[in-house]
Structure formats: structure tokens, C-alpha cells
From Swiss-Prot:
Subunit annotation: Consists of two subunits, CofG and CofH.
EC number(s) given by UniProt: 4.3.1.32
A GO molecular-function annotation: iron ion binding
CDD domains tied to this protein: Radical_SAM
Cofactor: [4Fe-4S] cluster
Protein name listed in UniProt: 7,8-didemethyl-8-hydroxy-5-deazariboflavin synthase
Primary role: Catalyzes the radical-mediated synthesis of 7,8-didemethyl-8-hydroxy-5-deazariboflavin from 5-amino-5-(4-hydroxybenzyl)-6-(D-ribitylimino)-5,6-dihydrouracil.
Pfam family, one: Radical_SAM
Gene3D superfamilies in alphabetical order: Aldolase class I
Tree of life domain: Archaea
Top enzyme category: lyase
Catalytic activity: 5-amino-5-(4-hydroxybenzyl)-6-(D-ribitylimino)-5,6-dihydrouracil + S-adenosyl-L-methionine = 7,8-didemethyl-8-hydroxy-5-deazariboflavin + 5'-deoxyadenosine + L-methionine + NH4(+) + H(+)
Species whose genome carries this gene: Methanosarcina mazei (strain ATCC BAA-159 / DSM 3647 / Goe1 / Go1 / JCM 11833 / OCM 88) (Methanosarcina frisia)
Binding positions for [4Fe-4S] cluster per the UniProt entry: C15, C19, C22
Amino acid sequence: MTYSKNVFIPVTNICRNQCGYCGFRREPGQPGARLMKPEEVISVLENGVRAGCTEALFTFGERAEEVPGYGEMLEEIGYSSTLEYLVFLCETAIDIGILPHTNAGIMTRSELEALKPLNASMGLMLESTAVLAAHKDCPGKIPERRLETIREAGKLKIPYTTGLLIGIGESRDDRIESLEAIAALHREYGHIQEVIIQNFAPKPGTEMENFPEPAVEEMMDSVELAARILPGDVAVQVAPNLIDPKSLIAKGVTDLGGISPLTIDWINPEAEWPDVKNLQKKLGDIPLKERLPVYPPYVKKGWYSERIGSLIKRLSDNSGYRKQPGTENAEDSEK
């Protein structure tokens, strides 16, 4: 059972989509609207390295430039585009000693090309191939557009994370179709390292605040479908702060995602991360093994750029997993 140790950095919560279930999004000028300043991000990155984290998860609202007022927020910190700022943040993370994983919504091929050398992996939740009421005001949630981004990442050989959001109005057949679409892309390009099966959690003040959460049985079935439909080299992940993973492991869960010792889950702020030691106790004789934000097979295949290669080598062991923290420099000096 694998996991990574990360810092969760919500660079901006300004977003062009208005999902019926989202409590993260804000409009410029609203209370809680943010674009993190460089010094704020750098502080989190430095604390993350000190705490032994290997992953900087950069999350963004999608295409914030389309939202009036966001451009001025960018200008205030000295940048002309989100991409320009993100490139700076990724470069800074690498220099500080932590691997970027960017999740910024749908992207063009040229945007992916700009970010590929600076990211250990990238991600975009497919959520569903179904057209849903929850996504009615969301130009970025058109399934074909999301699949196109995932496809372009495959063509560029970017180790990739995607997933399904369970319980937002989709049917079981929709879940099967979504998993089959992901499986087909992986068979073609070999780049999907993990698929998250994430349970919907209602947020107060949203359109779907009274929508029922999916039952545990529904999650067990969804995990079972994922394990059956996805190729065997794709990890099936659940979020241990949103659901007790114990009952899902027998159904095919192999990974517990990024767990942070420092930062909250900004998308689900009410759901605390479990402590890794407590999680290990709960899992009993199933050993927890730490990985990097890029999975071991992709480390071994060399699916990374020269820019991050030395950092990946420093942080990974011979099997491509996380090297025992504290031994990185000692082992480097022995080589």
C-alpha cells in the first residue's frame, strides 16, 4: 500500500467553472478569494522539505484568467499569466528540493509542454464521462475536453493522475464508461500511473449541500470496477481523509495518495489527514510504503527531465520508491 508525503498548495481558488458541489471556488473580491504570493508559497515549500515531504501539489482553479478581476491579482504579484507564475513556482520548488505535481484543470498541448520538464507528474480528474447537472455552468467539465488533456499528456509521456468523483449524479454505467475511457488512453500511451476513486462529500453553502453522500457499498463497488477495468499497472487510489480505506483494500485499492504532515486538504478542509503511524496501525499487516509523486515504474523508465532528474535520483531508492529520509546525502556521498 503506497502513499506520498506532500504539501498541498492552493495557488488560487479563482475558477471559471461553477460546479454544484465545490466549496473551494471564490470570485475575486469575495471573502476567502486568494492568489498566493510567492513568499507564501516559498515558506510552505521550505517547511515541506524540512518535514521530509517530496511532493508539492500545486492546485488551481481552472482558467482563472477568464474571471474578471483575476488579471489584476496576477499583476499585483508581478506576473502576466498563470502559466508564467506556475513555471516560476515549479522552478522554485525544484531548487528548494521538492518535486512539483501540478493539477490546474484542462490544458493545451503547449501548456503541458512548458510544464513537463518541471513536474514529476501531473493530474486532472476526469470525474465522469457523463454530462451532469452538477457541471451545467462548467465549460471545463465537458468530458471530451478533459479526455483531450489526458490524451495530450499521454502523447508527451507525462506520468499522469486522473480519477472519478463518485456520487455527483452519475450512474453505475457512467462509471464503467469513464473507467473504460481511462483504460483505453492508458493502453495507448502507458502514462496513467493512478486513478483516484473519490467519494463526493457535500459542502455547506453549495447547490449540492443536501445531496446524499455515496454509500460505502457504492464505493466498494466502484473500487472493484476500477480494479477490474483498469490495466494491472494502474494504481487504484482512495483518499484516507474522506473514507476509511480498510474496507476498500480488499476490493482493489493499492494507494492512499498524498498525505500531508503540514497542510490541510484545501478542497475538503473539513477532512483531516490521518497520521501515517495511526494509518499503519489501522492497516495491520499491510505495510505502508512511501513513494514519490512519480510512481516507481516511471522512475525506472526515466520518464522525467534532466531538470528534475538529479532530485528524483536523490529522493528515490533502487526500486524507485522513496529513499529512507535522512539517508539521501549520505548515500550520495558514498557513490
